[in-house]
């Protein structure tokens, strides 16, 4: 049967106290609205409409790669009005429409699939995802008849005293027969405490028309909506625990899973060991048998097999097999580091290529450079790539030995099999096989200290 989805994302989220729309706040590295869109797509719902309102352009920009359509809700008149604004999306469609909220990012793929199967198998006009909670304050209540069939949903502010005692709550997520939903939307009224058009009223309307109403209980954490920074932190903690559990089940060792921060969609190979304090962001891919000692940040990078990283930052770069990075290294965007390379303490590499088996052991800056294989950089080497206006290129050939405290003033080329003497400032090309010395000769002035009377 055909199915589609509407995601409600027009709410302003005033309790977030933010200048950006609520649904654009991130959970584990991804905007909440995109988390919801992605999980809906994984549940095999491809036709998705997002209802947007104030700041609509920001939401559209954040979701434009998701191939969704959009409806606009100009005034915040309730969830029923929001779905009504998507009428053009539903026009001439037959089948099932699922309705989700863009601020409920914890719903699971299997739950959505189960809801669709449950709805279709039961022949329901509407199906509600519900949950049983001990403290239902603030949630709409599921009111059932004596035979346990769903009668209606009553919003918290409209509940009678006995209805307030009900523990089964509405998650705000549903699926409907499309034709039944369209007919019912025109019948809802705003005669309630909020003066809004509730989507929940559709349930009672369908019931009165003889339609069957289904209710599928799910774990409460999946129903959690995010309306404040506190709830955002709570949702992120739940999602982070899910992510970490999946990686551990797939063969990754997390020494302290409560203090390891892995974004959604990160890939990590088996037998990798991760110590606490590490942060993995963006679309990072990590190979097998890697070790991440405490307190590194890896963002949108590819880390190949058998890499060791210690207390370092790697941004939008690629690290080859059997390489070690850190401690206190800084790998900046557009860097490619080869196999069996050593990037040591207080080394910064920016927009450069480092060949296989090269050693950059400590206190070095390499920027806008192409470095060959089997090179060695002495302590204090600086690639001087910026002249105040432009960034210039440095080329360093294979098997080059760069002595300590060397400046390579770009643009400059150092050919294969060369040596550069410590303390040199290199401004000209170094021929293959040459030793370059670019420093003043040492002068010793005998007895100078005593003649000056500095010491007796």
Swiss-Prot record:
A GO biological-process term: UDP-N-acetylglucosamine biosynthetic process
Cofactor(s) essential for the protein: Mg(2+)
Matching Pfam families: Hexapep, NTP_transferase
Primary location class: cytoplasm
Positions annotated to bind Mg(2+): 103, 227
Residues of the active site: 362
Catalytic activity: alpha-D-glucosamine 1-phosphate + acetyl-CoA = N-acetyl-alpha-D-glucosamine 1-phosphate + CoA + H(+); N-acetyl-alpha-D-glucosamine 1-phosphate + UTP + H(+) = UDP-N-acetyl-alpha-D-glucosamine + diphosphate
NCBIfam families noted in UniProt: glmU, PRK14354.1
Protein name: Bifunctional protein GlmU
Organism whose genome encodes this protein: Clostridium kluyveri (strain ATCC 8527 / DSM 555 / NBRC 12016 / NCIMB 10680 / K1)
Classification lineage: Bacteria, Bacillati, Bacillota, Clostridia, Eubacteriales
């Amino acid at each position: 049967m055909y199915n589609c989805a509407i995601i409600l994302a027009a709410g302003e989220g005033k309790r977030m106290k933010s200048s950006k729309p609520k649904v654009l706040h991130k959970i584990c590295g991804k905007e909440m609205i995109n988390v919801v869109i992605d999980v809906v797509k994984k549940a095999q719902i491809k036709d998705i409409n997002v209802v947007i309102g104030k700041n609509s352009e920001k939401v559209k920009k954040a979701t434009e790669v998701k191939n969704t359509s959009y409806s606009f809700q100009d005034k915040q008149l309730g969830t029923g009005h929001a779905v009504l604004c998507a009428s053009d999306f539903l026009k001439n469609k037959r089948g099932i429409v699922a309705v989700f909220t863009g601020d409920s990012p914890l719903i699971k793929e299997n739950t959505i699939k189960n809801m669709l199967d449950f709805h279709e198998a039961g022949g329901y006009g509407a199906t509600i995802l519900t949950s049983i909670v001990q403290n239902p304050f603030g949630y709409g209540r599921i009111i059932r008849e004596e035979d346990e069939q769903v009668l209606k949903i009553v919003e918290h502010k409209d509940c009678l005293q006995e209805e307030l005692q009900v523990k089964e709550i509405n998650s705000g997520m549903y699926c409907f027969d499309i034709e039944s939903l369209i007919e019912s939307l025109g019948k809802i009224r705003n005669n309630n405490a909020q003066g809004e058009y509730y989507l929940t009223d559709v349930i009672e309307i369908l019931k009165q028309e003889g339609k069957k109403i289904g209710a599928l209980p799910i774990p409460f954490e999946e129903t959690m909506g995010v309306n404040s920074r506190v709830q955002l932190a709570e949702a992120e903690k739940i999602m982070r625990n899910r992510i970490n559990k999946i990686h551990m089940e797939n063969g990754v060792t997390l020494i302290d899973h409560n203090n390891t921060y892995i974004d959604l969609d990160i890939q990590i190979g088996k037998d990798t060991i991760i110590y606490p304090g590490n942060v993995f962001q963006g679309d990072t891919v990590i190979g097998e048998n890697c070790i991440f000692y405490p307190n590194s940040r890896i963002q949108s990078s590819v880390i190949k097999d058998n890499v060791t990283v210690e207390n370092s930052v790697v941004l939008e770069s690629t690290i080859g097999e059997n390489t070690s990075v850190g401690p206190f290294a800084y790998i900046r965007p557009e860097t490619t580091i080869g196999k069996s390379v050593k990037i040591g303490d207080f080394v910064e590499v920016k927009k450069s290529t480092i060949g296989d088996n090269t050693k950059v052991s400590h206190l070095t800056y390499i920027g806008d450079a192409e470095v060959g294989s089997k090179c060695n950089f002495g302590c204090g080497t600086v690639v001087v790539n910026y002249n105040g206006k432009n960034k210039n290129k440095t080329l360093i050939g294979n098997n080059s030995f760069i002595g300590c405290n060397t400046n390579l003033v770009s643009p400059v080329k150092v050919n294969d099999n060369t040596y550069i003497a410590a303390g040199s400032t290199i401004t000209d090309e170094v021929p293959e096989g040459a030793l370059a010395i670019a420093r003043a000769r040492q002068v010793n002035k005998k007895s100078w200290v005593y003649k000056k009377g500095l010491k007796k």
